[in-house]
Amino acid sequence: NFKPGTMSKYGLDYATLSQVNGRLIYVTCKGFLPGPYEHRTALDEVVQMMGGLAYMTGRPGDPLRAGTSVNDIMGGMFGAIGALGALVQRGITGKGQEIASALFENNVFLVGQHMLQYAITGKPASPMPDRISAWAVYDVFTVKDGEQIFLAAVSDAQWSTFCHLLGFADLLADPRYATNNERVEQRKTLMPVLRDRLSKLSAAHLSAEFEKAGLPFAPIRKPEELFDDEHLNATGALADITLPDGEHAGETARATLQIGRASCRERVYHPV
């Protein structure tokens, strides 16, 4: 991490290096693109707070950073995508270029859907915990033994399947819940009933039934529980790596390093 101007100070900026190699593709990841903010120190929290993401993530009056460093991660991804485009263009023009990715602009891209909503409708988006869902059944439920699971029924057909699957014939026949729009309007009466009934069922049972029926579901998992995820282990998405240094040097850890269909266990090295 360098302050703005550091690379120029050492003669390692694009303007200097491109004079040595005109085919150079130079990726720089910044806090802010050139403009009034470019001198500021950027952190993921900084751009999440000023870029609307923390506002949308937390409850009203309680802005909250996302549960991972989304801008650090995606800023690097945007830089890599830009480099790939520059490689294609260099194949046509024979010339390199500088690619700039920035945390703040990346964050604004992430909240772009909410900005567009306001631009089109004039209605500002509410924070996600306070939003009015487009579907009535689209929530996290606390079930047997205190476990939690996300369940959804996002169409009238899925609502019918949901009710048949769980034996909720009375809810399916209730005219108040006939269509999705009506279910959304009646959410304050419907959700307490669903929460009470679902609390008697286990997350494992609901997962199995929803999977067989093709309904959306997701048990709530902690990051450390993903090491035992059967899908991740079957696809090779988790790779064993040997730590090169530090107090745990030589030890093996598992990381999410799969690229495409090739597992990191099958490494392919290409010349630089």
Q: In which residue ranges do the predicted regions lie?
A:
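Aromatic-enriched alpha-helical interface/lid elements that frame and gate functional surfaces
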Residues: V137-A213, F217, R265
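Structural signal for conserved beta-strand scaffold positions within catalytic alpha/beta enzyme cores
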Residues: T28, L103, A173-T179, P219, ...
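Active-site-adjacent "lid/gating" segments in soluble enzymes
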Residues: T6-A153
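Short secondary-structure capping/turn micro-motifs that flank functional sites
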Residues: G35, T179, L226-F227
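Short Gly/Pro-enriched turn/cap motifs at secondary-structure boundaries
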Residues: M128-S133, D139-V140, E185, E247-R254
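Single conserved hydrophobic/aromatic residue that forms the stacking wall/gate
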Residues: A262, E266-V272
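A glycine-rich dinucleotide-binding beta-alpha-beta segment and adjacent secondary-structure elements
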Residues: K212-S263
